[in-house]
Swiss-Prot record:
InterPro entries xref list: Ccc1_fam (IPR008217)
Origin species: Acanthamoeba castellanii (strain ATCC 30010 / Neff)
Keyword Zinc attributed: no
Protein name (record): Vacuolar iron transporter
Gene: VIT
GO molecular function: manganese ion transmembrane transporter activity; metal ion binding
Length: 261
C-alpha cells in the first residue's frame, strides 16, 4: 500500500508551475539524456540543401561539352547568384515581418501591461491551465522577460536573431557553386556524349542522396528517408529537364537566331 501511495505521489505535480510544465510538454531529459532542438539550424540548413540540390539538378541536366560547357559554367554562376538573392530576399522578408510583430508587441507591453498579462494568461487557460495558475505563471514569465514570453506564446517566435538574410544567401551561393561544379567537371572530362550523360547522372544521384542524408542528419530526421526523398525528386527533375532539352534539339530550337535590323 505504501508503494502504491509513493508511486501516486510521484505522478502528481509538486507545484502549479510544474503543472504548467507538464501541460506544455516541458519534461526533463530521461536517464540523463540531453535533448537539443534542431530548430536553430533550420535557416542555414534549408539554404544549403536548396542550393546544393538546385545546383546538382540544373548542371547535371545541361549535358555540357565544348561551347555548351561555357554556357553551363555561366549558368552555374547565374544560378548561384539567383539562389543567393532569392534566399536573401526570402529570409529578409521573414525577418522584417517578425521585427514588425515584435515592435508592435513591445509597444503594447509599454502602454498596456495589464492587458498583455491577461492576454498571456488566457493563452495558457485555452491550453487547459486553471485561471489562478495561468495568471501566476504569466506574471512570473513577464517579470523575467515580458517580450520573450509574448513572442513565444502569442507570436510563435522562439529564436530571436536567428534570421540572418546575408548568411543564408551566402550559404546558398556557396553550396550551389560547390555541388554544381562536380557534375560540370565530370561532363568536361568525358568526351563521349552518352558516357558523359551516364556518368553525370550517376554522380548526380549519389550527390543528391548525400545531400538528402546530410540534411536529414542535421535536421534530426531519418537519413534513409531523407536521401530517398531528395534523390527521387532530383531524378524526376533531371529527367524532365533532359527531356525538354532533347525535345528542343529535335525541334531545332537551338538553330533559331535573332534577325539583324
Amino acid at each position: 500500500m505504501a508503494e502504491h501511495t509513493e508511486e501516486t505521489n510521484l505522478l502528481q505535480p509538486t507545484s502549479r508551475f510544474q503543472l504548467l510544465k507538464d501541460i506544455l510538454g516541458l519534461y526533463p531529459a530521461i536517464d540523463g539524456e540531453k535533448h537539443k532542438s534542431t530548430l536553430g539550424t533550420a535557416g542555414w540548413l534549408r539554404a544549403g540543401v536548396l542550393g546544393a540540390n538546385d545546383a546538382i539538378v540544373s548542371v547535371a541536366a545541361s549535358n555540357s561539352q565544348g561551347q555548351v560547357l561555357i554556357a553551363a559554367l555561366a549558368a552555374l554562376f547565374a544560378g548561384a547568384l539567383s539562389m543567393a538573392v532569392g534566399e536573401y530576399v526570402s529570409v529578409a522578408s521573414q525577418k522584417d515581418m517578425e521585427d514588425a510583430d515584435l515592435e508592435k508587441e513591445r509597444w503594447e507591453l509599454e502602454n498596456n501591461p495589464e492587458g498583455e498579462l491577461e492576454e498571456l494568461s488566457l493563452l495558457y487557460q485555452e491550453r487547459g491551465v486553471d485561471p489562478v495558475t495561468a495568471t501566476e505563471v504569466a506574471r512570473q514569465l513577464m517579470a523575467k522577460d515580458a517580450l520573450q514570453a509574448h513572442a513565444i506564446e502569442e507570436l510563435g517566435i522562439r529564436d530571436f536573431s536567428q534570421a540572418r538574410p546575408f548568411a543564408a544567401g551566402m550559404v546558398s551561393f556557396a553550396m550551389f557553386i560547390t555541388f554544381g561544379c562536380i557534375p560540370l567537371l565530370v561532363g568536361a572530362w568525358i568526351p563521349y556524349r552518352w558516357y558523359a550523360i551516364g556518368a553525370i547522372t550517376g554522380v548526380s544521384l549519389i550527390l543528391l542522396a548525400i545531400s538528402g542524408a546530410v540534411g536529414a542528419f542535421f535536421g534530426g530526421a531519418n537519413m534513409l528517408l531523407g536521401a530517398f526523398r531528395v534523390t527521387y525528386g532530383g531524378a524526376l527533375a533531371m529527367a524532365i529537364t533532359i527531356g525538354v532539352g532533347f525535345l528542343s534539339e529535335t525541334l531545332n530550337i537551338s538553330d533559331m537566331s535573332y534577325r539583324d535590323e
